[in-house]
């Protein structure tokens, strides 16, 4: 279910403060965050945000197509190693 338009997008306050500081100082270092639930705002475009996937921080470079999505969508939490191969029986 989508969020109500009258409520607006959700962004953690500490993440927004870090992003505003990075934009003001023109810092190019990744902004480290654990907030996967925060929505990507237009202010984030051009920044690299290191999103935690449960094990490590995955660097995500924000582009204009990402606006409106959640940060957690771009840092996968599960790795798919493939289905087990069939064992061939030698005669």
From Swiss-Prot:
Keyword Repeat included in the entry's annotation: no
UniProt-listed GO biological process terms: ribosomal small subunit assembly; translation
Keyword tRNA processing listed: no
PROSITE patterns linked: RIBOSOMAL_S19
Keywords, alphabetical: Ribonucleoprotein, Ribosomal protein, RNA-binding, rRNA-binding
GO terms assigned for molecular function: rRNA binding; structural constituent of ribosome
Domain of life of the organism encoding this protein: Bacteria
GO cellular component, as recorded: cytoplasm; small ribosomal subunit
Biological role stated in the UniProt entry: Protein S19 forms a complex with S13 that binds strongly to the 16S ribosomal RNA.
Protein family membership: Belongs to the universal ribosomal protein uS19 family.
Annotated protein name in UniProt: Small ribosomal subunit protein uS19
Gene source species: Verminephrobacter eiseniae (strain EF01-2)
């Amino acid at each position: 279910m989508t969020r109500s338009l009258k409520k607006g997008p959700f962004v953690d306050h500490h993440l927004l403060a870090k992003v505003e500081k990075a934009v003001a100082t023109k810092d190019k270092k990744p902004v480290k965050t654990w907030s996967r639930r925060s929505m990507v705002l237009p202010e984030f475009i051009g920044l690299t945000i290191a999103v935690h996937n449960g094990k490590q921080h995955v660097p995500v470079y924000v582009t204009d197509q990402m606006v409106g999505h959640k940060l957690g969508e771009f840092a996968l939490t599960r790795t798919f190693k493939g289905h087990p191969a069939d064992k061939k029986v030698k005669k």
